[in-house]
Amino acid sequence: MIILITNDDGFESEGIRLLKEIAQNFASEVWIVAPDADRSGAARSLDYPVKQFIKISQHSEREFSVSGTPADCVIIALNKIMNKKPDLILSGVNIGSNVGDDICYSGTIGAAMEGAARSIPSIALSQVYHDKIDWNNTKIFAPKVIAKLMKVGWPKDIVMSINFPATEKVKGVEFAEQGEYNIDGDLTFTENLNGSLSLNWSREHSGSGSVDKIKGGFITITPIKLDFTDYDILNAMKNSCAEEFSSIANTPIASD
Protein backbone atom coordinates (compact mmCIF):
# COMPACT_ATOMS: atom_id res chain seq x y z
CA MET A 1 0.00 0.00 0.00
CA ILE A 2 1.17 3.52 -0.84
CA ILE A 3 0.20 6.21 1.67
CA LEU A 4 0.44 9.98 1.30
CA ILE A 5 0.63 12.00 4.52
CA THR A 6 -0.03 15.71 4.90
CA ASN A 7 -1.28 18.11 7.58
CA ASP A 8 -1.93 21.77 8.37
CA ASP A 9 0.41 22.16 11.36
CA GLY A 10 3.48 22.04 9.12
CA PHE A 11 6.26 19.72 8.04
CA GLU A 12 8.05 19.90 11.41
CA SER A 13 4.97 19.08 13.50
CA GLU A 14 5.12 16.25 16.04
CA GLY A 15 1.77 15.03 14.75
CA ILE A 16 2.99 14.31 11.24
CA ARG A 17 6.02 12.41 12.58
CA LEU A 18 3.69 10.27 14.68
CA LEU A 19 1.46 9.71 11.66
CA LYS A 20 4.45 8.50 9.67
CA GLU A 21 5.13 5.89 12.38
CA ILE A 22 1.48 4.82 12.28
CA ALA A 23 1.40 4.64 8.46
CA GLN A 24 4.43 2.35 8.41
CA ASN A 25 2.21 -0.34 9.97
CA PHE A 26 0.28 -0.55 6.69
CA ALA A 27 2.40 0.84 3.89
CA SER A 28 5.14 -0.31 1.58
CA GLU A 29 5.72 3.37 0.75
CA VAL A 30 5.03 6.40 2.93
CA TRP A 31 5.22 9.85 1.34
CA ILE A 32 5.09 13.13 3.27
CA VAL A 33 4.12 16.31 1.44
CA ALA A 34 3.22 19.02 3.95
CA PRO A 35 3.22 22.81 4.31
CA ASP A 36 6.59 24.38 5.15
CA ALA A 37 4.90 26.41 7.92
CA ASP A 38 1.85 26.18 10.15
CA ARG A 39 -1.24 26.61 7.95
CA SER A 40 -3.91 25.91 10.55
CA GLY A 41 -7.28 27.30 9.54
CA ALA A 42 -6.48 27.14 5.82
CA ALA A 43 -9.53 24.94 5.15
CA ARG A 44 -9.45 23.75 1.51
CA SER A 45 -8.02 27.03 0.24
CA LEU A 46 -5.36 27.21 -2.47
CA ASP A 47 -2.34 29.50 -2.63
CA TYR A 48 -1.12 28.74 -6.13
CA PRO A 49 -3.86 30.61 -8.06
CA VAL A 50 -2.88 33.82 -6.21
CA LYS A 51 0.87 33.36 -5.75
CA GLN A 52 1.46 31.90 -9.21
CA PHE A 53 4.45 30.04 -7.78
CA ILE A 54 5.05 27.39 -5.13
CA LYS A 55 8.39 26.35 -3.65
CA ILE A 56 8.98 22.61 -3.17
CA SER A 57 11.80 21.53 -0.84
CA GLN A 58 12.95 17.90 -0.75
CA HIS A 59 14.15 16.60 2.64
CA SER A 60 14.57 12.91 1.81
CA GLU A 61 13.57 10.48 -0.93
CA ARG A 62 9.86 10.66 -0.05
CA GLU A 63 9.57 13.72 2.20
CA PHE A 64 8.81 17.21 0.87
CA SER A 65 7.68 20.57 2.23
CA VAL A 66 5.67 23.00 0.14
CA SER A 67 5.16 26.76 0.47
CA GLY A 68 1.41 26.38 0.15
CA THR A 69 -1.75 25.25 1.85
CA PRO A 70 -2.59 21.66 2.83
CA ALA A 71 -4.81 21.35 -0.26
CA ASP A 72 -1.95 22.69 -2.41
CA CYS A 73 0.24 19.95 -0.93
CA VAL A 74 -2.17 17.21 -1.99
CA ILE A 75 -2.50 18.60 -5.51
CA ILE A 76 1.27 18.98 -5.91
CA ALA A 77 1.96 15.54 -4.42
CA LEU A 78 -0.43 13.84 -6.84
CA ASN A 79 0.54 15.79 -9.95
CA LYS A 80 4.22 16.61 -9.49
CA ILE A 81 5.99 14.67 -6.75
CA MET A 82 4.62 11.13 -6.61
CA ASN A 83 5.10 8.69 -9.46
CA LYS A 84 2.09 6.55 -8.44
CA LYS A 85 -1.36 7.36 -7.10
CA PRO A 86 -1.57 6.65 -3.36
CA ASP A 87 -3.99 4.06 -2.03
CA LEU A 88 -4.74 6.18 1.03
CA ILE A 89 -4.28 9.78 2.20
CA LEU A 90 -3.82 10.47 5.92
CA SER A 91 -4.05 14.08 7.11
CA GLY A 92 -2.80 15.04 10.58
CA VAL A 93 -2.34 14.26 13.28
CA ASN A 94 -3.85 17.65 14.06
CA ILE A 95 -2.98 19.42 17.31
CA GLY A 96 -6.49 19.82 18.72
CA SER A 97 -9.93 18.53 17.81
CA ASN A 98 -11.74 19.00 14.52
CA VAL A 99 -15.41 19.02 15.47
CA GLY A 100 -18.34 21.40 15.14
CA ASP A 101 -17.53 24.43 13.00
CA ASP A 102 -13.82 23.52 13.10
CA ILE A 103 -14.59 21.30 10.12
CA CYS A 104 -15.20 24.38 7.95
CA TYR A 105 -11.93 26.03 9.01
CA SER A 106 -9.60 23.05 9.29
CA GLY A 107 -6.72 22.60 6.87
CA THR A 108 -6.45 19.03 8.12
CA ILE A 109 -9.99 18.35 6.91
CA GLY A 110 -9.40 20.44 3.78
CA ALA A 111 -6.43 18.33 2.70
CA ALA A 112 -8.42 15.13 3.19
CA MET A 113 -11.28 16.60 1.16
CA GLU A 114 -8.86 17.38 -1.66
CA GLY A 115 -7.91 13.71 -1.71
CA ALA A 116 -11.51 12.52 -1.57
CA ALA A 117 -12.36 14.82 -4.48
CA ARG A 118 -9.88 12.75 -6.49
CA SER A 119 -11.51 9.47 -5.40
CA ILE A 120 -8.68 8.55 -3.03
CA PRO A 121 -9.75 7.17 0.38
CA SER A 122 -8.86 9.97 2.81
CA ILE A 123 -8.80 10.12 6.60
CA ALA A 124 -8.27 13.16 8.84
CA LEU A 125 -6.91 12.51 12.34
CA SER A 126 -6.98 14.94 15.28
CA GLN A 127 -5.79 14.72 18.89
CA VAL A 128 -7.70 16.69 21.52
CA TYR A 129 -5.64 18.40 24.21
CA HIS A 130 -6.16 20.68 27.19
CA ASP A 131 -3.03 22.32 28.61
CA LYS A 132 -0.41 20.10 26.99
CA ILE A 133 -0.65 17.78 23.99
CA ASP A 134 -0.45 14.07 24.80
CA TRP A 135 -0.28 11.82 21.74
CA ASN A 136 -0.71 8.56 23.63
CA ASN A 137 -4.31 7.81 22.61
CA THR A 138 -3.54 8.46 18.95
CA LYS A 139 -0.40 6.33 19.13
CA ILE A 140 -2.24 3.38 20.67
CA PHE A 141 -5.58 3.47 18.86
CA ALA A 142 -5.03 5.12 15.46
CA PRO A 143 -3.48 2.01 13.83
CA LYS A 144 -6.46 -0.10 14.94
CA VAL A 145 -9.10 2.43 13.84
CA ILE A 146 -7.45 3.00 10.44
CA ALA A 147 -7.17 -0.76 9.86
CA LYS A 148 -10.87 -1.27 10.67
CA LEU A 149 -11.92 1.59 8.39
CA MET A 150 -9.86 0.22 5.52
CA LYS A 151 -11.43 -3.19 6.06
CA VAL A 152 -15.06 -1.98 5.97
CA GLY A 153 -14.49 0.71 3.32
CA TRP A 154 -16.53 3.85 2.58
CA PRO A 155 -17.62 5.93 -0.44
CA LYS A 156 -14.73 7.72 -2.13
CA ASP A 157 -16.42 11.15 -1.91
CA ILE A 158 -16.55 10.94 1.89
CA VAL A 159 -13.78 11.98 4.28
CA MET A 160 -13.46 10.05 7.52
CA SER A 161 -12.61 12.37 10.42
CA ILE A 162 -11.25 10.68 13.55
CA ASN A 163 -10.89 12.57 16.84
CA PHE A 164 -8.96 11.09 19.76
CA PRO A 165 -9.91 12.25 23.28
CA ALA A 166 -7.51 13.71 25.82
CA THR A 167 -8.86 11.52 28.61
CA GLU A 168 -6.54 9.08 30.38
CA LYS A 169 -8.88 6.16 29.64
CA VAL A 170 -10.56 5.66 26.26
CA LYS A 171 -14.09 4.31 26.70
CA GLY A 172 -14.59 3.13 23.13
CA VAL A 173 -15.24 4.22 19.56
CA GLU A 174 -18.44 6.03 18.51
CA PHE A 175 -19.77 7.09 15.12
CA ALA A 176 -21.02 10.63 15.65
CA GLU A 177 -22.15 13.79 13.87
CA GLN A 178 -19.76 16.76 13.91
CA GLY A 179 -21.64 18.48 16.76
CA GLU A 180 -21.90 22.20 17.44
CA TYR A 181 -20.04 25.01 19.15
CA ASN A 182 -21.35 28.37 20.27
CA ILE A 183 -20.06 30.24 17.21
CA ASP A 184 -19.74 33.55 19.10
CA GLY A 185 -18.03 32.25 22.21
CA ASP A 186 -15.69 34.49 24.19
CA LEU A 187 -13.76 36.59 21.68
CA THR A 188 -11.00 38.76 23.15
CA PHE A 189 -8.77 41.24 21.30
CA THR A 190 -5.47 42.49 22.72
CA GLU A 191 -3.68 45.40 21.07
CA ASN A 192 0.07 44.87 20.66
CA LEU A 193 2.76 47.53 20.83
CA ASN A 194 3.16 47.54 17.05
CA GLY A 195 -0.55 48.27 16.56
CA SER A 196 -1.51 44.72 15.57
CA LEU A 197 -4.18 42.72 17.37
CA SER A 198 -3.88 39.38 19.13
CA LEU A 199 -7.08 37.34 19.17
CA ASN A 200 -8.19 34.72 21.66
CA TRP A 201 -11.32 32.73 20.84
CA SER A 202 -12.78 30.49 23.52
CA ARG A 203 -15.95 28.59 22.57
CA GLU A 204 -18.37 26.46 24.52
CA HIS A 205 -19.75 23.24 23.03
CA SER A 206 -23.46 22.55 22.71
CA GLY A 207 -23.31 19.09 24.25
CA SER A 208 -24.06 17.22 21.05
CA GLY A 209 -22.39 14.88 18.59
CA SER A 210 -18.63 14.42 18.49
CA VAL A 211 -18.03 17.36 20.81
CA ASP A 212 -19.87 15.71 23.67
CA LYS A 213 -18.62 12.16 23.05
CA ILE A 214 -14.96 13.19 22.88
CA LYS A 215 -15.30 15.00 26.18
CA GLY A 216 -16.75 11.78 27.59
CA GLY A 217 -13.66 9.81 26.58
CA PHE A 218 -14.72 8.31 23.26
CA ILE A 219 -12.83 8.19 19.98
CA THR A 220 -15.23 9.56 17.36
CA ILE A 221 -15.52 8.83 13.66
CA THR A 222 -17.46 11.33 11.55
CA PRO A 223 -18.15 10.86 7.81
CA ILE A 224 -17.94 14.24 6.03
CA LYS A 225 -19.50 14.81 2.61
CA LEU A 226 -17.85 16.76 -0.18
CA ASP A 227 -21.29 17.77 -1.45
CA PHE A 228 -22.67 20.53 0.80
CA THR A 229 -26.09 20.53 -0.86
CA ASP A 230 -29.10 20.16 1.45
CA TYR A 231 -31.24 17.97 -0.78
CA ASP A 232 -34.31 18.11 1.47
CA ILE A 233 -34.41 21.92 1.24
CA LEU A 234 -33.49 21.84 -2.45
CA ASN A 235 -36.41 19.55 -3.31
CA ALA A 236 -38.78 21.52 -1.09
CA MET A 237 -37.82 24.76 -2.83
CA LYS A 238 -38.20 23.17 -6.26
CA ASN A 239 -41.72 22.13 -5.32
CA SER A 240 -42.86 25.30 -3.58
CA CYS A 241 -40.79 28.17 -4.99
CA ALA A 242 -39.91 27.33 -8.61
CA GLU A 243 -42.89 29.16 -10.10
CA GLU A 244 -42.22 32.24 -7.98
CA PHE A 245 -38.67 32.51 -9.29
CA SER A 246 -39.44 31.54 -12.89
CA SER A 247 -40.96 34.97 -13.51
CA ILE A 248 -37.61 36.69 -12.94
CA ALA A 249 -36.23 35.71 -16.36
CA ASN A 250 -39.42 36.94 -18.01
CA THR A 251 -39.29 40.41 -16.46
CA PRO A 252 -38.75 43.07 -19.17
CA ILE A 253 -35.43 44.89 -18.92
CA ALA A 254 -35.86 48.65 -18.86
CA SER A 255 -33.98 50.48 -21.60
CA ASP A 256 -31.90 53.57 -20.88
From Swiss-Prot:
UniProt-annotated location(s): Cytoplasm
Cofactor binding note from Swiss-Prot or TrEMBL: Binds 1 divalent metal cation per subunit.
Main location: cytoplasm
Cofactors named for this entry: a divalent metal cation
Record-listed E.C. numbers: 3.1.3.5
Reaction equations catalysed: a ribonucleoside 5'-phosphate + H2O = a ribonucleoside + phosphate
GO molecular function, one term: metal ion binding
NCBIfam families named among the record's database cross-references: PRK00346.1-4, surE
Function description: Nucleotidase that shows phosphatase activity on nucleoside 5'-monophosphates.
Recorded family membership: Belongs to the SurE nucleotidase family.
Official protein name in the record: 5'-nucleotidase SurE
Species of provenance: Wolbachia pipientis subsp. Culex pipiens (strain wPip)
